[in-house]
Regions:
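Short internal beta-strands
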Residues: 154-160
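Short glycine/proline- and acidic residue-enriched helix-loop micro-motifs
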Residues: 99-107
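Gly/Ser/Thr-rich loops at beta-strand to alpha-helix junctions
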Residues: 130-141
């Protein structure tokens, strides 16, 4: 088992990585490291063996904590790209292409989506509004930071 997957599983179990976006982002980062560090065993085909390694890793993570919907979509994407990887490419080229695809997926589906939500939600906060939240959400935090950036007069009160 790759060390990044083990660390992520422990973080899921103890709750130190929580929230849908944070968990999906951490999953993609761990899968990226797994792919980047992967070495094809002698006599194996990258797409088949890496697919099995990803399956085993996901099984471990599900045992630590069930996947959210966005995480399930990310796993489907990564597995489909691994299965499609060309046997004609050298292993280093195939790994590089897979890492680039994971990075692009992460940018589009996690980072861009979070920025779009923050942009839209920040528009609902106006001068003089009081916003009280309970708990922590990356999307809510990003929205409030964007609203704070837009407003001229600001007052903040944070409670731990």
């Amino acid at each position: 088992m790759h060390p990044a997957i083990l660390r992520l599983g422990l973080a899921y179990s103890d709750g130190s990585v929580a929230g849908g976006s944070a968990r999906a982002d951490a999953l993609l980062a761990a899968l990226r490291r797994l792919v980047a560090d992967y070495a094809v065993p002698e006599g194996k085909v990258l797409s088949r063996d890496l697919y099995a390694v990803v399956n085993t890793s996901i099984g471990f993570l599900v045992e630590c904590r069930p996947l959210s919907a966005s995480m399930g979509s990310a796993v489907k994407f990564v597995k489909s790209q691994v299965a499609r990887s060309s046997a004609d490419l050298r292993p280093a080229e195939a790994r590089g292409a897979l890492v680039a695809l994971v990075d692009a997926y992460r940018a589009e589906k996690v980072e861009f989506a979070l920025a779009a939500v923050a942009e839209r939600a920040a528009g609902y906060v106006e001068e003089g509004d009081v916003v009280l939240t309970y708990g922590h959400s990356g999307a809510v935090l990003a929205s409030l930071l964007e609203a704070d950036r837009r407003l001229r007069r600001r007052r903040r009160a944070l409670f731990g």
